[in-house]
């Protein structure tokens, strides 16, 4: 009987050593997926907003007003840039806007997240170019002289 007294404690230590990292990894994977889905929804909303907003630049470089409104839409969920970011640590510098031009007007607008990092327990995940969404442009392009 004396030889069996420590076996339960030993089994508990081994099981804990395996289960704690397993549960931590599962939690972190779930949290990363949750954040990615929030970012995907924000990017989709920003691309939808950009596809309907008047494009006021004659080139593939959007005007500062257009860019800031679309970036605010992605980061804050509104073009004014008020409130809390949709995801902790997300800033306007993490949002890229790429109009795909057809002459003087965009044919489509691509919005994506770049350089956004999620800190995990053992490492860090950085999103570069993902999530990304492209919408066909349905707004009006302002005429330029």
Per-range role (PLM):
Residues 8-27:
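Alpha-helical hydrophobic helix detector
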